[in-house]
UniProtKB/Swiss-Prot annotation:
This is Transcription factor Zelda. It comes from Drosophila melanogaster (Fruit fly). A zinc finger (C2H2-type) spans 552-576, 1326-1349, 1355-1378, 1384-1407, 1413-1435. SUPFAM superfamilies: beta-beta-alpha zinc fingers. The lineage of its organism: Eukaryota, Metazoa, Ecdysozoa, Arthropoda, Hexapoda. GO terms for molecular function: chromatin loop anchoring activity; DNA-binding transcription activator activity, RNA polymerase II-specific; DNA-binding transcription factor activity, RNA polymerase II-specific; nucleosome binding; RNA polymerase II cis-regulatory region sequence-specific DNA binding; sequence-specific DNA binding; transcription cis-regulatory region binding; zinc ion binding. Disruption phenotype: Embryonic lethality: embryos are defective in cellular blastoderm formation and fail to activate genes essential for cellularization, sex determination and pattern formation. Cells display nucleosome occupancy at dorsal (dl)-bound regions. Transcription factor required for zygotic genome activation (ZGA), a critical event in early embryonic development during which the developmental control passes from maternally provided mRNAs to the expression of the zygotic genome after fertilization. Binds to regulatory DNA sequences containing a 5'-CAGGTAG-3' sequence motif, which are highly enriched among developmental enhancers. Within 1 hour into development, or by the embryo's 8th nuclear cycle, binds the majority of its motifs genome-wide. The gene is zld. 'Vielfaeltig' means 'versatile' or 'manifold' in German.
Length: 1596
């Protein structure tokens, strides 16, 4: 309960809330008691309503937060009167408690409640009232979930109120909540995991115990030691309609959770419940989805509208959730009809939401989300969050129950986190708070502290920018409820992040206990603010308009733009130029626009107030989400900035300082103003606390879930800020993913939400995630971020044991950690967070190490981190101390990562452990913003890895190589972003050790974590093997891999849900493990997966820590730059499975339901044939000419599944394969084109030959053609004979090689030796099939191939397309384009030339008037041979694939029609084709009768495959030469000799046929099936034509 307090607004707000709460007593009489203990947060929410008036008491009455919610926040929907009254009851005591807590004693929740009750009405911002209302609910929820969860929810509620009312208020509330959170951390004894059992559906006015909801609340209550907890839960029930429904159109409005939380196991709260226990129904179309992520995906894909508009604002769902007559948190209408306030879908959502609300209420209870309270906060944040809403929409599935109505930040805090955490979630502070609560055992207190940072929150909140910062804060705030969630939720910009965070929060609050009540978070994600409510409208100036997401980021100014044009225009502004000068970083304008385009950035994330604060907040929130633990969440975006490139990553300057503060101080540092570069200790504390809570609450799962969800959001946000994303993603994602795994196990929905909710978030973070890979920020950013999310779960895991071991201590530690985390978040958000969970000291170390970002430190830290994890149990206690230290050190502002890192390193043993993570994180950050973050660079290996981090999928691929045995799990870990694998790995170890602890979930991951720590520390390798085995066991038990998959893939969420995620224990197990590993990140074996996510960790680093991880990382390293993602459309269960099984954490589900499959380039390479060309096409200088990873998902899946069982080693191997644009496969696709082109050219030069051959075949044509052919053939006859001899070889080669480049022309007889990708043209010139360039000598071709088709040529001339390896050469080359005066000028015209030969050729061709090169077909003359060559291509042009096909079909038809002639050439065997070809060449020289000619082709054809086709061709030619001309390409050519026009057409046809024959023949050789076609084509062509075809094939 105490934890809730932090979230509570001031007493006056609390009072208002209390009255509201009383009104909402629907929560139950117990609610009153719970309010006292766990209703601190709830207090504000209920109090706010009460303060506004008793009127809100009506079930629908929104906690209008009286005057407070005045900003543009609609009144927050109040829970039912019963709930409100209950809340009031709870809140009043809570207010007292809050006061006490504020005094430093007593239940923070009570204090908050008192504050709210007494001050809510007076609070300047309705936010507090809203918060109060939500606080009351939170109280109820807390009761249900225990003080912890309820506290979180309350906080979140209070937070929501603040949020809705105004940024300032929101921040204040957050601060309050933070304060309360701290208290809650210590006070709350209940795990959210336990307490998360109950979830209040927004529409259901009763608690749904998806998690064992009420019983969970009871357990939470017991743990919290306060009956009020139960009350809180009840209240939450009444209020539950609040967030879930409203929060995300997709989540709440878009889907109804049928089966709701109640159907779920306690392990999976609302979100999980939705995914595990209930089917979610799309409110818009009624479609039922398995989990929220699916729903989100569906909503995003089908009901896309605007993320915000579509679902209205989270607050709107909120209102709906308050359902009875919930007003949107609009300031004014306390009793406004929910429908009235709902935007767009809100009304629809209201009713659906009512049902949803019931389910979500349960979720809410689970998530500890006060529905009523959330709406108001949502409103204030809504506009900002609206953008995030989109991603949130998808994510809402996970957090749908509680988060739906809330803004993403709120939802995260509320839905994802625990009541308190949720409250915080809306802002950075609440977010962490939720995590603290999530840490559950000790989390509540921390959350309270975060809220205790109420003033801070307010302070930040008032500022718009700060509001955004709060977004970041929510990142931190999300810590409580899956810090991430809160973190993301905090800031509208971060909504996606919030969504991610939301799940985390939910996971923290409900995930651990009930799979983290994911429902909360997803809503955030989907449209955290989409809930149609005034808040949505008020908060967002265009709440209902679908606006273009701001995907273009100016890293120097942290500004986001909707189009590249706007960005370019911005580059010309003085503001930008000054920023660049002051930053000392290279001007981003010099980079390709693609480097600044982060499509993954969800509209939600980036749109809301992206300007500065919003963007920063969003980034922070997203980062926090990514961190999956408030700490990481907040810093991730800011941390990178803090590191060095802070400016770049942050959405906005506030993001930077505030971002750091947000990230770091989001929870405890909500107060820390997101503006401030350094996160406040509180934030970090909260983050840590949140992490801790998650773990304590079994939130390993919840956190993972919530975080995972948030992470996606974060990713989206991160996308906006690469650094942010990278850091966030790297660690955050790791954590988040791991958490997601846990959470997914509990709440697959949650996971889904994360991925789905924030497709872009997913994608977006990818690039930032790979600091290194800034080159391909958008793609990598997109893909990898998600995986990185996994790391948070490990953190959670570590934390969980600690929590289990010492709830109170853990709480304290969590609190410190939260702050530390937040700070870390700034600098090493993910690492800190991750480490936080493994142990506080770990967090600190990580944070510091991250700051240090020294390779040595990283490796050392990794190893130590492993040890730390070993010592996790011991360290947990230490961790608390360390955490505190860390907080202090982190206070250094992880923003200034280096310093913080050093500080963190203070903890010798833990820091070492953490250090690696931190470093890793730093590296991530550094890599992400390598240009801006020097500190990260200290991890050069990581620097290389960052891209990997970006492409952690690749990492996953890589991972297999070193750890065949572990590879299975390890690889999974790697590939699943170390989500599942990490979780799996750690889980395996931890389960035995930690099963008894806290909760099964927590225990599992704790056990995994501790054992992992111990084992890793003691014997990383053995541990890894053990983990691997255990992971497998766990995988089997928990289907961790599946969970990982789910985590990795939002779509997979359902899978996750069905698999272990569904069950609390399995999720916890895998999640925590992942989390721990993630934090250690790669240092541990599990980390490798994370490393996949968090590429930044250098393989060496990983290796030192865990041999297997290093493997992963090692391979990853080379690949990271090549990492890319493949978009998979459709549900991701299979994909997820592939990921989990395949060990590819590359699949990321985007908010729009797309599943991005990240594939290492090397993986891609093996499948190069699939899209080598596309790779080449896609390659861009910025991507370093690495092959896109868009290679078939199939390949990836194959890799994944193969890799999963140590098959990943092969995958790694594949990865290792260097990308070569000229891969034969690449040629494969172009083969036809090349063949055709080659054939055309061949025809051009060889046409005469063909004509002659045809002419020979066709008497008329034969004579004319023979003359020409004789001339040509006699010249080339020797060559031809050679070719004939060689052609079989060439042909064989063709068969063996997809792109053999035998010469098509007879002259090519020697072409065979040219190169596999070249062909000799009839003219004797050698043509490069890769780029169609021609050369007179082989040496030129060789030189050309070396220069253009091998190795990496990153410098590409935009004018002529030439590529250069070195910048010097490239610069020199560019000079030539610029040079106006070229040395050689034409005396007859103004033209100038660089080379004398060019001038001479020009004069001869243009000015002499001599046209000595004549076209044999049309008799046109050309002054230059190359002109003639080009012209000849026009004759062959019609011979395109299509024409070829038509010609082939015609030939086939003719063949069928004329079967009589089939016997003509039946004698020759298949081998005779080549002979025929040779013969045809001979025939060409010696005019052969049509019959003879036909016989030859027919024989080969017959021998090869289709006698009929042969006969047809033979028949056509033999029977009717003139008919043949039409049917047979060859004959056309011959005819052409006679009739130019007809020849042209025929020639074209012949070319087509020939090309088809070439291809067919090639295929024939490869597959006999194609023999028929080849035969047909060959038949159609006379022997001579066959020769041509043969040559063509050779070319192929």
């Amino acid at each position: 309960m105490t934890s809730i307090k932090t979230e509570m607004p001031p007493l006056h707000a609390a009072e208002a809330l209390a009255s509201s709460s009383a009104t909402d007593s629907g929560g139950g009489g117990a609610g009153g008691g719970g309010g006292g203990g766990g209703g601190g947060s709830g207090g504000p929410g209920a109090g706010g309503t009460g303060g506004v008036g008793s009127a809100p008491a009506t079930p629908n009455a929104t906690i209008s937060a009286a005057a407070d919610s005045s900003d543009n926040q609609p009144g927050t929907p109040q829970p039912t009167q019963q709930q409100q009254s209950t809340q009031q009851q709870l809140q009043q005591p809570q207010s007292q408690q809050q006061q006490q807590q504020a005094m430093g004693g007593g239940d923070p929740q009570q204090q908050q409640q008192q504050q709210q009750v007494t001050g809510i009405t007076h609070q300047p911002y309705a936010t507090h009232h809203m918060y109060s209302a939500s606080g009351g609910q939170q109280q109820q929820q807390q009761q249900i979930y225990g003080g912890l969860y309820g506290g979180d929810m309350q906080q979140q509620q209070g937070y929501a109120s603040s949020y809705i009312n105004s940024y300032e208020q929101f921040y204040q509330q957050q601060q309050q909540q933070q304060q309360g959170t701290d208290y809650a951390f210590g006070t709350v004894g209940v795990d959210y995991g336990k307490s998360a059992g109950v979830r209040y559906h927004p529409y259901l006015q009763t608690p749904t115990s998806g998690l064992g909801g009420i019983p969970t609340a009871s357990s939470a209550q017991e743990e919290a030691g306060s009956a009020p907890s139960a009350v809180s839960t009840t209240t939450a029930v009444a209020m539950s309609p609040r967030v879930v429904s409203s929060s995300s159109p997709t989540s709440t409005s878009s889907h109804l959770q049928l089966g709701s939380s109640s159907g779920q196991t306690p392990g999976s709260p609302g979100g999980a419940a939705g995914s595990a226990g209930c089917k979610l129904q799309c409110k818009k179309c009624g479609i039922l989805t398995t989990n929220e992520s699916e729903l989100q995906e569906h909503i995003a894909n089908v009901h896309g509208e605007s993320p915000y508009g579509s679902s209205g604002y989270a607050s709107s769902p909120y209102i709906k959730e308050e359902m009875p007559t919930p007003q949107p948190p609009g300031v004014g209408s306390a009793t406004a009809n929910p429908g009235e306030l709902l935007d767009l879908d809100s009304q629809k959502m209201v009713y659906h939401q009512q049902l949803l609300q019931q389910q979500q209420q349960q979720h809410d209870v689970v998530a500890g989300l006060p529905l009523g309270a959330l709406p108001d906060p949502l409103h204030s944040m809504q506009s900002m969050q609206q953008r995030a809403l989109h991603s949130w929409e998808q994510q809402p599935q996970q957090t749908v129950a509680s988060v739906e109505g809330l803004p993403p930040y709120m939802q995260q805090g509320l839905g994802v986190g625990l009541g308190v955490g949720v409250d915080k979630s809306p802002y950075y502070s609440p977010k962490q708070s939720p995590y603290h609560q999530s840490t559950g055992v000790g989390g509540a207190t921390l959350i309270k502290q975060e809220y205790g940072g109420h003033g801070l929150i307010k302070s930040e909140y008032p500022d718009s920018q700060h509001y955004v910062d709060k977004s970041f804060d929510p990142t931190a705030g999300g810590a409580g409820g899956a810090e991430l969630c809160a973190s993301v939720a905090t800031s509208p910009a971060e909504f996606p992040s919030t969504t991610t965070g939301g799940p985390g929060q939910e996971g923290a609050a409900g995930a651990a206990p009930g799979g983290g009540y994911r429902g909360f978070e997803p809503p955030s994600s989907s449209s955290v603010l989409p809930a149609n409510s005034l808040t949505a409208k008020a908060a967002t100036w265009k709440s209902n308009e679908a606006r273009r997401p701001k995907t273009y980021n100016c890293t120097a100014c942290n500004k986001w733009f909707t189009s590249s044009g706007h960005l370019k225009r911005h580059y010309n502004t003085t503001l930008h130029k000054n920023a660049v000068k002051s930053s000392g970083q290279p001007d981003p304008a010099t980079l390709p626009i693609s480097a600044h385009h982060h499509p993954a950035r969800d509209p939600v994330t980036k749109p809301s107030r992206r300007g500065n604060a919003a963007a920063a907040a969003a980034a922070a929130a997203a980062a926090a989400s990514a961190s999956g633990q408030g700490q990481q969440q907040q810093p991730p975006i800011p941390p990178p900035p803090a590191n060095v490139p802070p400016p770049e990553p942050p959405r906005s300057p506030p993001d930077y300082g505030g971002g750091g503060g947000l990230g770091v101080g989001a929870m405890g540092g909500a107060a820390m103003s997101q503006y401030s570069a350094s996160p406040s200790p509180t934030q970090q504390q909260q983050h840590h606390l949140n992490h801790h809570q998650q773990q304590a609450n079994g939130y390993a799962n919840g956190t993972a879930n919530g975080y995972g969800y948030m992470q996606q959001q974060v990713q989206s946000t991160t996308n906006a800020s690469p650094q942010h994303a990278s850091n966030n993603n790297s660690n955050n994602q790791q954590q988040q993913q791991q958490q997601q795994q846990h959470h997914q196990q509990q709440m697959p929905q949650h996971h889904n939400s994360v991925l789905n909710g924030h497709p872009n978030g997913l994608a977006g973070p990818s690039a930032p995630h790979n600091n290194n890979t800034t080159q391909m920020p958008s793609s990598q950013m997109r893909g990898l971020l998600n995986e990185t999310t996994t790391t948070p779960p490990p953190t959670t895991t570590t934390r969980a044991p600690q929590i289990t071991t010492t709830a109170t201590t853990t709480t304290t530690a969590a609190t410190t950690v939260a702050i530390k985390s937040e700070q870390m978040e700034d600098s090493n958000h993910t690492h800190t967070h991750t480490h936080t969970h493994p142990n506080h000291s770990h967090s600190q170390d990580r944070s510091h190490s991250s700051s240090s970002s020294s390779s040595m430190a990283t490796e050392e830290a990794e190893e130590q981190e492993l040890r730390d994890q070993e010592q996790a149990d011991d360290h947990l206690h230490q961790h608390q101390q360390a955490s505190q230290q860390y907080l202090l050190s982190a206070r250094h502002y992880h923003s200034s990562t280096p310093n913080t890192l050093s500080s963190s390193n203070t903890n010798p043993s833990t820091p070492s452990s953490n250090s690696p993570h931190t470093i890793y994180r730093q590296e991530q950050q550094g890599t992400d913003f390598s240009r801006t973050t020097p500190p990260p660079q200290p991890l050069p290996p990581m620097g290389m890895l960052p891209p990997m981090a970006m492409d952690y999928n690749m990492l996953a691929l890589d991972m297999p190589m070193p750890m065949p045995t572990l590879m299975h799990s390890n690889m999974l870990q790697c590939s699943s972003t170390s989500t599942t694998p990490l979780a799996t790995t750690i889980t395996t170890s931890m389960p035995d050790t930690m099963q008894p602890p806290q909760q099964q979930l927590v225990h599992h991951y704790q056990a995994v974590l501790h054992p992992l720590h111990q084992q890793l520390g003691e014997q990383h390798q053995r541990q890894e093997a053990d983990h691997h085995q255990q992971q497998r066991e766990l995988h089997q038990l928990d289907q961790q891999q599946q969970q990982q998959q789910a985590l990795i893939l939002a779509d997979s969420l359902p899978h996750s849900s069905s698999s272990p995620t569904s069950s609390s224990p399995p999720p916890t197990m895998p999640m925590p493990l992942t989390t721990i590993t993630a934090p250690q990140l790669l240092p541990l074996q599990p980390p490798p997966p994370h490393i996949t996510s968090t590429m930044p960790m250098p393989p060496t680093m990983h290796m030192p820590i865990m041999p297997p991880p290093p493997q992963c990382y090692q391979q990853l390293q080379p690949l990271d730059p090549t990492m890319s993602y493949h978009t998979i459309i459709g549900s991701g269960p299979e994909a997820h499975t592939g990921t989990a099984g395949g060990g590819y954490s590359n699949q990321i589900t985007t908010s729009d339901g797309q599943i991005l499959q990240l594939m290492p380039t090397s993986l891609f390479a093996p499948y190069a044939p699939l899209s080598p060309y596309s790779v080449a096409a896609q390659r861009s200088p910025q991507e370093g000419d690495l092959p896109p990873v868009h290679t078939l998902t199939t390949a990836l899946h194959a890799h994944q599944q193969g890799g999963q069982q140590e098959a990943q080693t092969p995958t790694l191997t594949v990865l290792s394969t260097p990308y070569s644009p000229t891969v034969s496969s690449s040629r494969a696709t172009p083969a036809l084109e090349m063949d055709m082109a080659t054939l055309m050219q061949h025809h051009q030069d060889y046409e005469m030959e063909q004509y002659q051959m045809q002419h020979q075949q066709l008497d008329q044509m034969q004579q004319h053609q023979q003359q020409l052919d004789h001339q040509q053939q006699q010249q080339i006859l020797a060559d031809q004979t050679q070719t004939m001899a060689q052609q079989p070889l060439a042909k064989k080669r063709r068969g063996g090689n997809a792109t053999p480049s035998t010469t098509k022309r007879r002259r090519n007889s020697s072409v065979g030796s040219t190169s596999p990708h070249s062909t000799t043209l009839p003219s004797g010139r050698i043509k490069c099939l890769e780029c169609d360039k021609e050369f007179t000598k082989n040496c030129y071709l060789t030189q050309h191939n070396k220069s253009f088709h091998s190795g990496e040529y990153p410098f590409r001339c935009q004018k002529c397309g030439k590529r250069f390896q070195s910048e010097d050469v490239y610069t020199t080359h560019l000079g030539r384009h610029r040079t106006q005066d070229k040395p050689h000028k034409c005396e007859l015209c103004p033209k100038q030339f660089h080379h004398k030969t060019d001038l001479r050729r020009h004069v001869e061709a243009i000015h002499t008037g001599l046209k000595q090169h004549m076209c044999d077909i049309c008799e046109k003359g050309f002054c230059r041979k190359d002109h003639l060559r080009k012209h000849l291509e026009t004759h062959n042009r019609p011979r395109v694939v299509g024409k070829k096909s038509a010609a082939a079909a015609a030939a086939a038809a003719a063949a069928a029609a004329v079967t009589a002639t089939a016997g003509l050439g039946g004698a020759p065997a298949a081998g005779s084709i080549k002979a025929a070809f040779a013969r045809s060449l001979t025939v060409t020289a010696v005019s052969s009768e049509p019959g003879a000619g036909v016989a030859i082709p027919s024989a080969p054809a017959t021998a090869t495959c289709a006698p009929v086709s042969v006969s047809a061709s033979a028949l056509v030619q033999a029977v009717n030469p003139s008919l043949t001309s039409g049917l047979s390409l060859k004959r056309h050519i011959d005819d052409v000799a006679v009739d130019d026009d007809s020849l042209l057409e025929e020639d074209e046809d012949e070319m087509e046929m020939e090309m088809e024959m070439d291809m067919l023949e090639e295929e024939d050789e490869e597959e006999e099936e194609l023999g028929d076609h080849h035969m047909i084509i060959k038949s159609e062509y006379v022997q001579e034509e066959f020769q041509m075809i043969e040559k063509s094939i050779e070319l192929y």
